[in-house]
Amino acid sequence: MKAILFVASLLFMTTAQAEVFVVNDKIEPVTLEDQFEQPLVVNEQTQWVLFSRGMKGGELIQASLESLPAEKQPENLVYIADISGMPSLIARFVAIPKMKDLPFSMGLDREGDVTATFPSEKDMASVIKLDKFNVVSIEHFDSSGAITEAISQ
């Protein structure tokens, strides 16, 4: 009897987990604080979301955005980083102060809840194209040049 209850609870737990959104899904508006504690919003006008769940993906996005002059960066681009895996003391006293030196804003998901449904691949950056909250495409890149090329279209 205990085994049956255990298996049933495992089945329930897997169905209760958030599913990653895919192409043709409609996402909800997102609001996060950036590294300056200002709101950063994914709204109806947002066409590009750059997303990183790990350090490597974040480095790729940073290199891509730093390589583009400010006037060449798409206006409707939002960068979001899931920093929930980072120890809070490291985030507070080391990482976020360094992020304040960057020439762009990045939404910080400190708990990982907001971005739980965001697609990601290990050591890669995700580039999500939106049209009024509808997911048009999802690509994962392992080079900053490829990210720059994708968002410059």
PLM feature segments, named:
Residues M1-I4:
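Positively charged n-region of N-terminal signal peptides that target proteins for export
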Residues M13-Q17:
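N-terminal signal peptide c-region/cleavage motif recognized by signal peptidases
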Residues A18-D25:
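Cleaved targeting-peptide boundary
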Residues N43-E44, R110-I147:
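Thiol/disulfide oxidoreductase modules built on the thioredoxin-like
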Residues W48, G57-K98:
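Structural microenvironment flanking redox-active thiols in thiol-disulfide oxidoreductases
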Residues M55-G57, I83-P87, G112-V114, V135-V136:
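Solvent-exposed loop/turn segments at secondary-structure junctions
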Residues V78-Y79, A95-S120:
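Short, internal strand/loop/helix patches
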